[in-house]
Structure formats: C-alpha cells, structure tokens
Amino acid sequence: VRGTRGGFIRELIESKKYTPEEFAAVQNERKSRGQSANADDGKIVEQQGMTMREKLEHMTATYSDRLTFAKSNIHGWGLVAKVFHKAGSIVTQFKGETCRSTVADIRESRYEEDGVDCYLLKQDDDTVVDCTFQGNYARFTNHSCNPYMYSKIVKVDNENHIIFFARTDIKAGEELTYNYRFESEDGKVPCYCGAQNCRGYLC
C-alpha cells in the first residue's frame, strides 16, 4: 500500500498456532506486561467477554477515541494509537470498497499510471478491499518488519472482514504498523521501518 509500485498485497499473514498450554502462558505474560505498561489516563481497550459482533461494534463506536493519524517517521502519514491497547485486542478493520481480484489488478495499474498511492488488501481468493478513495484510518498503516499488529479474516453475519489485532501491548502515541509482505513486480522497494530486524526492503 502507501504508494509502492507493484505493491498489491496478495496474501495475509497466518497467525502463529499455539497449543492450549502455550496460549495460556502467552496470555498470562501479556496480562502482567499490560498492567505494568499502562501509563495512560486509565483508558484501556477491554474486549473480554464480548462476542465477535460486539467487539466489531465496540471497535466502530470507539474508533475516533482510540485512533488517529499523524506524520510518520516511516513514510508519509501513519496510524497512531490515542489510548493503550492490550495485546490480542481488536485495533481496527481494513475498510473500503470490496471488489473482485481482476478489478483490483486493473485499478492498481490505473493508480500507478496516475501516480496515486494505492491501498489494496486481499480479503480472500476472489475479493480485495480497496481503501484508496473510501475507507478509514487503517489505510494509513505503514509497513514494519517488526509490526505492532497482525491480521485475521473474521466472518460475521456471513461477511468477511479484515481485522487488525494488537500483536503486543501498544501504548498511547505509538505508530501502529503491520507486516504487509509485499510482492513487488518492479523490483525491491526500500523499507524505512527502522526495526532491528528490518530486511531493508518491503518484499
């Protein structure tokens, strides 16, 4: 996304798979870190005990209270947390116009010819979400080789949604990032995420 040439995102990253024991250990560790890391004014994203539909509704209702965008040290504008988000909580949905993959390919070529930053993310084998001209703050999410968020396809009311979850505890004021794992058709695109494990390129 973010105006990279040939940067149409064709795959989402699969979440790490845990055994029940490993998952419980990770959750306990995250809870302990979350209690000590909260230096905010008491506003914390809490989603325990909610159904997925309720979580999505809560995400939408609190969107502008939790998220904003600002100039980024990585590239252009970036998505920024306004409050503390616990690891594992829903951060945002990648919203936009849903179109077929064939249409997305045509649009990407047109955006590139017109010099327009394109925001395209694959939802499933047949559909892509185009956030270029309509969508939410999620389109300002920059790439990082060590991101704060990971994605999952969540089905609610028989509709797929691309949801970004907090990969770790996120403090207010931190830029929210995601590993897009681009497929570039025009050569490697430099990465400026600044992470210690930065690969140097987006693909």
Identify the residue ranges that each predicted region occupies.
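Accessory low-complexity/Zn-finger-associated flanking regions
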Residues: V1-W77, V189-P190, A195-C203
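Generic detection of intrinsically disordered/low-complexity segments and helix-coil linkers/edges
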Residues: R2, L12, K17, E57, ...
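Intrinsically disordered, low-complexity segments enriched in small/polar residues
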Residues: G6, K16, E21, S109, ...
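Alpha-helical interaction segments
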Residues: F8, I13, L67, S109, ...
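Compositionally biased, intrinsically disordered low-complexity regions enriched in proline and serine
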Residues: T19, S64, E112, L120, ...
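Catalytic cores of histone-lysine modification enzymes
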Residues: R30, N38-I153
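C-terminal SET catalytic tail plus cysteine-rich post-SET Zn-binding segment of SAM-dependent SET-domain
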Residues: C145-C203
